[in-house]
C-alpha cells in the first residue's frame, strides 16, 4: 500500500521473572527511525532469576517515502530499503 507500512519485529531477553515489556517509543529523524524499548519491573519484588525471551512487533507511526532508512532499536541498527 502507499505509503508503505513498516512493521518492526523486536526480540530480546528479560532479566528475571518479574520484568516485562513496557513500551516502544519511536521518533523519525530524517532517514533514521529511532525506537526505544523499555521494560517495567515491580519495585522490591521477589522474582525468579530465570532469563526469558520476549518478542513484540510494532508498526512505525510515520508515512515513509521510498528510500533507504536506518532502524535504530536501543542503539542496534538495521538497514531498511523501501
From Swiss-Prot:
Keywords: Restriction system. It comes from the Bacteria. One of its GO terms (biological process) is DNA restriction-modification system. Could be a silencing control element for the regulation of the restriction system. This is Uncharacterized 10.2 kDa protein in HgiBIM 5'region. It comes from Herpetosiphon aurantiacus.
